[in-house]
């Protein structure tokens, strides 16, 4: 049985979820994307326009913490059976979340209840999780706390994984499958809504520049995870001669008897990557850097010499 779906999302993930659901016989009665920022067109918006799906670009659905009446009325007019939240960044009021007769389904890129919050991808790497996965749940009044409908795991987090590779290579395709499975289960009346186990719950805040700042008193393993977890955004960083420098394409080198202060630039490796001394006989290998507000360049082109010190 095809459902009338109101989809809230963005980017290629939102597009692919919408296309997958449409192929399964569901009708997109409303597609909500972020307002047009004047840059590259949103892939979900483009797909909606090509297929004639009703498209909305609202900046907000609440004002001063209260649901905007015009948004509630508009949403009700679509007579959606189900809301599908495909990586949306907007905060929807309960009147919209609970409006459709079948409620809402929301995607999250972790194995809930672990790693709740808006930067789950980064924190899984930063905190050394060994396995990743995705969850589709029914949202409630909490942050990523609602009952689970579909969960898919078994994704190992490799030693060279970044937030970007974890998402695009693994959790993105797995997430599209999970969303399709969850909608099918709801449509067919066989969905189970399993409460989350609070004993295994964790919540992490946003990964901002304070989190991304490298602390050279930490061991190389912790610094390597932070660099990879913050790649590509916001980019782990340290100061060189009073200037912020962000690191990308990082990896850990163990068993290095460098005898140097952590943060000191060592001789580059055979591939030209920057090597930086870290605590515990380790070094960080860096492929690309971005100085201040400049562009990313190869570490060899950074102009930061051997013997330079990051603080």
Where are the language model's segments positioned?
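One-carbon transfer enzymes
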Residues: 1-234, 282, 291-295, 300, ...
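C-terminal active-site/capping subdomain that shapes the small-molecule cofactor and substrate pocket
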Residues: 224-311
